[in-house]
Amino acid sequence: GSVLMHDGVVEGGTGELNRILEEEQPDTYVGMPTALLSMLRMCGKGSIKRALVSGDACPKTVMKAIEEILQTRLWPHYGSREMGLGGAICCTAHEGMHMRENHCITEIIDENGNVLPDGKWGELVITTIGMEAQPLIRYRTGDWSRIIPGRCLCGSEIKRLDFVKRMDPLGSIREMDELLFEIPELVDYCVKIVDGKKEITALFTSDNGEERIRSVLEEKDIRSWNCRKVKWEDLALYPGKRVTRQ
């Protein structure tokens, strides 16, 4: 069976989540990567052995931390609603993500719309093949990546996408994830852009968490923050009231 926590909902907070994990003994997690890492850091690994992370980008530091806790590998993939979700997926070589070339044509362009050769970084452009309801023709995704040149170590010649990130002049949330989730004491954080400056609220679990977070933020010249230590049983999860069992 499975326990569906709709929209991440557990009414009683992390203490209730921990009770459900102990009672149900799930071996697989399906959901957002940062939510998984927060859960693992607050509740521990428990019975979970593997994970399918989706719905959000998975930064390298988050992926590394999850892999270390679960002692397994994650398989990065790329997609979006506009292109029909599935666009590229990692292979056993873990050297980039193979594009689904039977589904979409992939290009990398510069700021003027010129197509760049393999190996050059630029904006990812997608043309879908066979989509009738919403075909995309040279759709500018707003994502920054490159096509890795040469054949993959797995032997396939299918095009590979490198690490994908958002094109954001103020710095993307993914970059903040890379920066902050490397701190083992961090459970979660939120960031606001006010007058072009970042304001960060961070939740951590140990006495030296605030000092480590403060040091990282100061290195990046982020001067506005609020750090708060939390106990796992007191940490509230996403608002809502429904837990559906199937």
For each of these PLM feature ranges, what is it?
Residues M5-Q246:
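Active-site glycine/GP-rich loop and adjacent strand/helix microenvironment
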